[in-house]
Amino acid sequence: MVRIVRSCLQSMLKLVNSLIGMVGIAMILYAVWLIRQWQEQMGNLPFADSDHPVPWFIYSFLGLGAILCVVTCAGHIAAETVNGCCLYLYMGFIVLLTMVEGGVVADIFLNRDWKKDFPEDPSGAFHQFSKFIESNFKICKWIGLSIVCVQGLSVLIAMLLKALGPHPHRHYDSDDEYNVSTVALLQDARQPPPYVVGEPMYGAKPGAWTVRLMKGQTGER
């Protein structure tokens, strides 16, 4: 029963983790599109040295998308191995991302002048993004809340997997995870058969005098 529950939780964590990875890939693609737009307008890449201010919005989207993809890979490894260290590392990354995203989302939804909290973006992408949020406020609100809920669900599933522990046939972190019947069979297989050390038991050998008497009796007959 525990094995079935563990397998279901592993599949659920991989599924939820894949959704986080899809969000990261979408952010990277959007950042690449913004880089393309910047190159068409300015004639060079935003990473090249220039006199223009740093396009922080493009950098932020690209970096956050890459971080989400790395966290997704770590989550798949943690879900497959059910290793305690990997699960703790994965949960730590997700909690940090959730705190940052939750702070940004709360500032956008609760503060009417949230644009003033961000620096000026020379690429103009931040202005377009803010206009899109204002025109589709309800949709963006539910999308943001869904992303935060998915990340929270991934942390909950990871905690349940850590409580169940790894598969018994893969890892033995403690003596309690050993199967008693398996250990007994292994001990029987490795234990040599019992034997008794002592002098060999042979029949009494006839002496030379006895042999002569027997030969003499045979000759008389």
Curated annotation (Swiss-Prot):
The modification Phosphoserine is found at S174. Pfam families: Tetraspanin (PF00335). GO terms for cellular component: vacuolar membrane. Residues 1-14, 75-88, 162-221 are cytoplasmic. Disruption phenotype: Slightly reduced efficiency of intracellular multiplication of tobamoviruses (e.g. crucifer strain TMV-Cg), characterized by a reduced amplification of TMV-related RNAs. It is a multi-pass membrane protein. Residues 36-53, 110-140 are extracellular. The chain crosses the membrane at residues 15-35, 54-74, 89-109, 141-161. The keyword Transmembrane applies. It is found in: Membrane; Vacuole membrane. Coiled coil: none annotated. The keyword Protein biosynthesis does not apply. Expressed in rosette leaves. May be involved in the regulation of cell differentiation. Promotes intracellular multiplication of tobamoviruses, probably being a component of the replication complex. Homodimer. Constituent of tobamovirus replication complex. Belongs to the tetraspanin (TM4SF) family. This is Tetraspanin-19. It comes from Arabidopsis thaliana (Mouse-ear cress). The gene is TOM2AH3.
